[in-house]
């Protein structure tokens, strides 16, 4: 059914060992194949690499990187032996700064890895840390635990960060020239206790060439106060990425954000559209668990005596050609949103296209809505030519919110509970919210008038349509179902 309507909207990512980098990642959950639309980094074969050791009681002056005489800092080890495996032993370290000189190669990447069974923690404070470094430049205004600039063929694995204004930061700048920076990976890292800005962020400022083959996988970002920034964010000139298997929770702003059009990678001059490269694109966001994300208590969103509950679990803000699948999102202000916050009156590129959202489970989002798409007022850019299918939405206050959007398909979704099934923004023109919503199913909706018969079949009882999060209707709802451990976390958060 092709529809348009109006509703309500609340105003609102030495020993030797054999190293292998991961390649095309394919996951199958039931009938769901994730990542099949977007090409991932190819499998690389490396020669044996030298291990360089870093320890909190090491010494940068007299050490040589062996187990008997380790370096004291990651920065020294990476500068001395790029293209090696840097084994970081347990202990406390000060902030780390890495640059292009620390790059590896396709055959011999620089790998910064926690020693097996040990817990190295990088602290984002100015205090002296035995064996570590003191913060460089910026003091309280800029306390980054681990910063990487213009390096490529580099992987950070199993490192923890604590505190600071930023946890792990990667940036590309124009100093890198017109060659893409590729094969950047952040894996199995833990970021906690950020006070100020980002947990993990990749900012691609270089408009001349993209960051590509970016992987953020298996990380945990928690207990972060992000202000008006995000828990995990990628932004700017990024072409080809994978965000997978991360756990993002208990933070006071957006969980995972994929951004375009903020001016990071604008062309300074010339005939090209200045925003041509300033957009995250061609990526996959899958198998992440995002929960307890809310701007409640975040002063950046306090106005007129109340907090604007507008923190998304997963947000595409100006990105394009992205697949979002098999994620479990719960207890967020907004579960999953696809939009742009910029107006096409300012630039014709300001719209969101080519996003497919499928086989996700979104539950218990009480701030506003489970799934939302479109610019939030009448002048913002369209979400268009996107597809939202085979998702299961459970007990979200509003299940689906439609804003400025057109030519999108919403089908094969299962909506269970909630007060409102589908809500249309009162701040957008009716003719600017024309999409196809059909072939879905719903049960136990509080306001049954919010369900048009053209949307699909309405059932009176949730037991007829699902067993927990598992759909009982063939071809409807998510093929991905959270395991019992995740369901237990959800149930506890809902208490």
Q: What kind of feature is each model-predicted range?
A:
Residues 1-11:
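N-terminal secretory signal peptides that target proteins for export/translocation
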Residues 11-24:
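Sec-dependent N-terminal signal peptides
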Residues 30-33:
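C-terminal motif of bacterial Sec signal peptides marking the signal peptidase cleavage site
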Residues 44, 61, 84, 105-107, ...:
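Acidic, glycine- and Ser/Thr-rich low-complexity intrinsically disordered tracts
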Residues 56, 68-71, 103-166, 193-195:
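Right-handed parallel beta-helix/beta-spiral solenoid domain characteristic of secreted/periplasmic
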Residues 56-97, 105, 142-144, 470-475, ...:
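Acidic Gly/Asp/Thr-rich repetitive segments characteristic of extracellular carbohydrate-active
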Residues 95, 143-145, 167-169, 197-201, ...:
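Structural detector of coil-to-beta-strand junctions
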Residues 115-119, 152-163, 179-195, 210-225, ...:
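Right-handed parallel beta-helix
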């Amino acid at each position: 059914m092709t529809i348009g309507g109006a509703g309500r909207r609340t105003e609102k990512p030495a020993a030797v060992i054999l190293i292998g980098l991961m390649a095309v990642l394919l996951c199958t959950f039931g009938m769901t194949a994730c990542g099949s639309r977007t090409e991932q980094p190819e499998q690389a074969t490396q020669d044996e690499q030298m291990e360089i050791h870093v320890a909190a009681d090491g010494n940068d002056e007299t050490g040589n990187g062996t187990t008997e005489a380790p370096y004291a800092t990651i920065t020294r080890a990476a500068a001395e032996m790029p293209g090696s495996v840097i084994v970081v032993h347990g202990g406390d370290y000060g902030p780390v700064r890495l640059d292009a000189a620390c790059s590896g190669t396709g055959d011999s990447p620089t790998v910064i890895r926690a020693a097996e069974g040990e817990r190295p923690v990088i602290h984002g404070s100015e205090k002296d840390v035995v064996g570590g470094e003191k913060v460089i430049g910026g003091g309280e205004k800029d306390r980054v635990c681990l910063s990487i600039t213009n390096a490529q063929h580099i992987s950070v694995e199993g490192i923890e960060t604590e505190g600071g204004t930023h946890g792990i930061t990667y940036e590309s700048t124009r100093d890198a020239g017109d060659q893409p920076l590729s094969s950047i990976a952040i894996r199995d890292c833990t970021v906690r206790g950020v006070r100020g800005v980002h947990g993990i962020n990749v900012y691609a400022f270089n408009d001349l060439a993209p960051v590509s083959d970016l992987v953020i996988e298996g990380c945990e970002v928690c207990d972060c106060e992000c202000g008006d920034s995000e828990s995990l964010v990628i932004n700017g000139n990024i072409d080809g990425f994978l965000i997978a298997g991360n756990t993002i929770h208990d933070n006071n702003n957006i969980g995972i954000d994929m951004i375009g059009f903020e001016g990071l990678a604008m062309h300074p001059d010339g005939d090209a559209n200045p925003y041509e490269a300033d957009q995250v694109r061609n990526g996959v966001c899958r198998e992440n668990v995002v929960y307890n994300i809310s701007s409640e208590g975040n002063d950046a969103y306090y106005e007129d005596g109340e907090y604007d509950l507008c923190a998304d679990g997963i947000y595409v803000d100006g990105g394009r050609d992205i697949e979002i699948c098999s994620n479990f999102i719960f207890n967020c202000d907004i579960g999953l949103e696809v939009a742009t916050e910029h107006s096409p009156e300012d630039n014709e590129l300001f719209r969101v296209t080519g996003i497919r959202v499928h086989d996700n489970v979104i539950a218990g989002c009480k701030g506003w809505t489970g799934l939302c798409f479109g610019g939030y007022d009448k002048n913002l850019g369209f979400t268009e030519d996107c597809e939202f299918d085979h998702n299961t939405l459970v007990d979200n206050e509003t299940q689906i919110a439609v804003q400025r959007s057109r030519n999108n398909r919403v089908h094969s979704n299962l909506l269970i509970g909630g007060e409102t099934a589908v809500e249309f923004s009162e701040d957008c023109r009716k003719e600017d919210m024309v999409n196809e919503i059909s072939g879905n199913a719903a049960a136990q909706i509080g306001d049954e008038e919010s369900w048009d018969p053209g949307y699909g079949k309405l059932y009176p009882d949730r037991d007829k349509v699902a067993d927990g999060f598992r759909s009982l209707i063939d071809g409807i709802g998510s093929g991905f179902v959270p395991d019992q451990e995740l369901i237990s976390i959800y149930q506890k958060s809902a208490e």
